[in-house]
Amino acid sequence: MKITIAQAPQYIEQEVTIGAWLSNKRSSGKIAFLQLRDGTGFMQGIVVKSDVSEDVFSTSKNITQESSLYVTGKIVEDTRSDFGYEMQVSNVEVIHEANDYPITPKEHGTEFLMDHRHLWLRSKKQHAVMKIRNEIIRSTYEYFNKEGFVKVDPPILTGSSAEGTTELFHTKYFDEEAYLSQSGQLYMEAAAMALGKVFSFGPTFRAEKSKTRRHLIEFWMIEPEMAFVEHEESLQIQENYVSHIVQSVLTNCKLELSVLDRDLSKLEKIKAPFPRISYDEAIDMLKEKGFDDIEWGEDFGAPHETAIAESYDMPVFITNYPKDIKAFYMKPHPDRSDVVLCADLIAPEGYGEIIGGSQRIDDLELMEQRYEEHGLTGPAYQWYLELRKYGSVPHSGFGLGLERTVAWLSGVEHVRETIPFPRLLNRLYP
């Protein structure tokens, strides 16, 4: 019977066949230890010389790293391994022999590994990170489906920028200028006026010449928009959502977190509600910590976010940023015209902002004023203005950056390890 490594616990003391690649091996005179992987997991196969034919043992000792195999044997429990099971091998059939595999068990530099990203993905650590990424995506759909949201797919090619910035990738759209989307938010607001509560999940693009460990040129975002939802209710949805994905990863990715040596105690305490501080309070906190490079009215950089997060062992909301450093569509605070009803969610352990969100302007006259202030004219933005003409309602939304969230939950240092094929300032291949 052919099974996967993940199915092995269901077949204890049974003889099965697994299609796998040889990730590593070691051998003595009488025993060969095969480290097998098949995409669903990793498992050790033990080949004992006295229990198999001469040909099988010779093959097991000489097969090269990353060769593909059919391995047959009996599944037994192995309490010493993280997986908990191993195979007592009776036969090895080589499908394809790999020669001179470039990523050997020794240490390699980052640039070398990035040049071979298509192969680096096969490693145990990268496999674990991708499985955690997958669990975050799975639990995202689970949460929003359970809460009555409708999945909507906004366009990737747009005629405008959601943020009103210049950090856009331009492309020709027949006889017109088009851009790769920075955010699906404007379209999601339109969808919310039709469907109530919606969310999208897709790639976004920022032409930022940034080389920090938190930035990618192409990254994926989860972007919910909600009609009849005001700022505080949106914050509650955000913290419940983040709590849900963290607990899902803890429940369903125990082995992967162990492979990554992640400190589980730091994740186990991530449960709503999250602390909230205002932008004003954050500025005061930074001053008390000795920061003299930030003044009221300026946005926070990575060192500032890290310093603020150090005061908490949970994600923390920073609310009510100055109007002038936030996007044109954010609703002013009812008691202060200089700040808006928005929040950034800062992850602990130095992982920075993982969510940005706000209540959106729902008043036509105020939005027209914002258009004028930001120089937003023409058909690219006219349709968005019309959302305030026909049955406008209070509404809010937010965007969660998937890769930063993966980095935080898996504990990896750089976001380049959180997406299969990262697009960086100096890297378009592989």
UniProtKB/Swiss-Prot annotation:
Native organism = Oceanobacillus iheyensis (strain DSM 14371 / CIP 107618 / JCM 11309 / KCTC 3954 / HTE831)
PANTHER family attached to this UniProt entry: ASPARAGINE--TRNA LIGASE, MITOCHONDRIAL-RELATED, ASPARTYL/LYSYL-TRNA SYNTHETASE
Q: What is this protein called?
A: Asparagine--tRNA ligase
Give the CC-aspect GO terms: cytoplasm
* MF term (GO), any: ATP binding
- Tell me which SUPFAM superfamilies the record gives: Class II aaRS and biotin synthetases (SSF55681), Nucleic acid-binding proteins (SSF50249)
Task: List the subcellular locations.
Answer: Cytoplasm
Q: Please list every transmembrane segment annotated in the UniProt record, as residue ranges.
A: none
* Record InterPro entries: Aa-tRNA-synt_II, aa-tRNA-synth_II, aa-tRNA-synth_II/BPL/LPL, Asn-tRNA-ligase, Asp/Asn-tRNA-synth_IIb, NA-bd_OB-fold, NA-bd_OB_tRNA
NCBIfam families recorded for this chain? asnS, PRK03932.1, PRK05159.1
Member of which family? Belongs to the class-II aminoacyl-tRNA synthetase family.
Gene Ontology BP annotations: asparaginyl-tRNA aminoacylation
Q: Which reaction does it catalyse?
A: tRNA(Asn) + L-asparagine + ATP = L-asparaginyl-tRNA(Asn) + AMP + diphosphate + H(+)
Tell me how this protein assembles.
Homodimer.
Which keywords belong to this entry? Answer: Aminoacyl-tRNA synthetase, ATP-binding, Cytoplasm, Ligase, Nucleotide-binding, Protein biosynthesis
Q: Name one Pfam family in it.
A: tRNA_anti-codon
